[in-house]
């Protein structure tokens, strides 16, 4: 079989590997979807309402119990796993392509646990898991089709983007993510490989995963005053996003992996569980918090709520949990943009709260991901907004980018 594969034209082998990756990561997206729903159903019951109602109907004691048990199980799992295997990040897998292969089953279980803890209410993102499984699959396909090391690295990067696309149904944004965050060189070949894999993965997963935009909000329009709003939000939200990014990076660097994880991570989950007894809004990856604001509902003590949400993400990641920061960043950006818009109203400047939330989310995402173009595409894709909003979003991310560059040069 391998001899036959090697006999094929190299370009055809690369094409087949890319198509196989798109189909495979689409199936990964479906698996993540069912795993998340299965854990949520097991933990909180089969409720057909929205996610916040799901948490509410479970009751405070059940929320506390689920998070407490999840903390113990997650701590034991990651302690045992990391004693036996080294978890390789996506960037590390790209760097080591052809030299060292990650332990497939260990990394697969590692990704599954990330989805499971989010389903149980952990305050982190789930997006890391499909990206990591996508890179695993890409590495195996690159070897199976006897690709050169250069193309294997490209395929692994494509796997990360395709995994993200399958779960969130945002193929174009996921393609930009590969170029901006993984440093893939811009070329026609790379563009073709990336977009082929992301769009195919999205198409394969769509019948199961797609239920409309992830976040529901009315169509937003912009006017001349939107330019002022974009500049103000970029100036005021970027520093908060820089602070959150710094916390998240520190948590990743200092993440507990030794025996202390066995008490520290369960304790972190108990802190979250104690808050969730009274405030289920803190549970999950931030989707509940963001959707409440996007639905024009108010949240009492919003500044405190955002601060606590950000600290909970740090607390879990620092004490041994793994998970993403993309969706928490989006939620924090939604809240920050809304706050800035309200602040302007107090001083007599009346601006559109809905646009303010989108601007805040884009600025926050662009800063934490260090990927402004990806942030614009994700904000539009997540909320189903029209491309006409690109103009104020570009202005906001441009101003935010200048602030970030000046900050990093200090």
Q: Where is each model-derived feature located?
A:
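Alpha-helical transmembrane segments and immediately membrane-proximal extracytoplasmic
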Residues: 1-410
């Amino acid at each position: 079989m391998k001899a036959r594969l090697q006999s094929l034209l190299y370009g055809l082998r690369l094409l087949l590997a890319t198509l196989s990756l798109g189909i495979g990561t689409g199936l990964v997206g479906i698996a993540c979807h069912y795993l998340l729903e299965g854990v949520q159903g097991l933990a909180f019951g089969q409720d057909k309402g929205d996610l916040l109602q799901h948490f509410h109907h479970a009751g405070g004691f059940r929320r506390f119990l689920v998070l407490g048990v999840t903390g113990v199980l997650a701590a034991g799992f990651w302690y045992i796993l990391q004693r036996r295997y080294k978890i390789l990040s996506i960037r590390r897998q790209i760097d080591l392509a052809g030299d060292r292969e990650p332990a497939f089953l260990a990394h697969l279980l590692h990704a599954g646990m990330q989805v499971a803890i989010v389903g149980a209410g952990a305050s982190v993102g789930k997006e890391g898991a499909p990206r990591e499984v996508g890179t695993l699959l890409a590495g195996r396909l690159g070897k199976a089709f006897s690709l050169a090391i250069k193309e294997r690295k490209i395929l692994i990067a494509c796997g990360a983007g395709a995994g993200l696309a399958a779960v969130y149904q945002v193929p174009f944004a996921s393609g930009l993510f590969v170029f901006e965050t993984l440093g893939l060189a811009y070329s026609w070949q790379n563009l073709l490989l990336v977009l082929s894999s992301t769009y195919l993965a999205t198409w394969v997963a769509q019948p199961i995963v797609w239920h409309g935009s992830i976040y529901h909000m009315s169509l937003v329009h912009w006017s001349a005053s939107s330019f002022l709003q974009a500049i103000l939000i970029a100036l005021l939200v970027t520093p908060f996003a820089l602070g959150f990014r710094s916390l998240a990076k520190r948590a990743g660097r200092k993440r507990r992996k030794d025996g202390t994880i066995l008490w520290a991570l369960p304790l972190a989950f108990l802190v979250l569980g104690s808050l969730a007894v009274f405030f289920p809004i803190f549970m999950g990856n931030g989707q509940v918090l963001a959707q409440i604001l996007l639905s024009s509902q108010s949240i009492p003590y919003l500044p405190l709520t955002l601060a606590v949400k950000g600290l909970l993400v740090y607390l879990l990641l620092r004490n041994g949990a793994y998970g993403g920061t993309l969706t928490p960043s989006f939620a924090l950006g939604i809240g920050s943009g809304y706050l800035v818009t309200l602040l302007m109203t107090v001083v007599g400047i009346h601006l559109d709260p809905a646009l303010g939330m989108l601007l805040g989310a884009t600025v926050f995402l662009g800063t934490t991901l260090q990927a402004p173009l990806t942030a614009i595409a994700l904000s539009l894709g997540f909320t189903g907004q029209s491309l006409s909003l690109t103009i104020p979003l570009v202005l906001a991310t441009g101003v935010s980018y200048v602030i970030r560059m000046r900050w990093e040069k200090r």
